[in-house]
Amino acid sequence: MELPEVGDEARSFGPFQNGESAYFSSVNRGKKSITIDLRTHRGGDIVRQLLKDCDVIVENFRPGSMDRFGLGYDQLSHSHPHLVYASISGFGQTGPYANRPGLDQIAQGMGGHMSVTGPPGSGPWRSGTAISDLSA
């Protein structure tokens, strides 16, 4: 599922082949994409409609976001007892960093990867490839 109006950020990553991001195409091969605004009632209704044909939800928002959208496990499991619901986030569901965003460059920095990339003496450099995202 992609963000309304802007889509997946990876669609803008070069290089491009036939007008499409080579990176986006490679990591999303064989997938179908939809756009739903979860912040709206209509978006929630669409997700609930899709659940009629789904067994699994995997979401990677910060903890509590899906509850605010009315789509948390407790809100959906009563009407969909078969549902497997996986919540993943950069820093887990609990703990002091739980509500922080989990982006690739943050994982690279906190994991120490940025300290060993780039020219000597330059300070931390982000890897050109989303290495934390791809290795997760």
Could you say what each language-model-derived stretch is?
Residues 1-135:
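N-terminal helix-loop segment corresponding to the beta1-alpha1 unit
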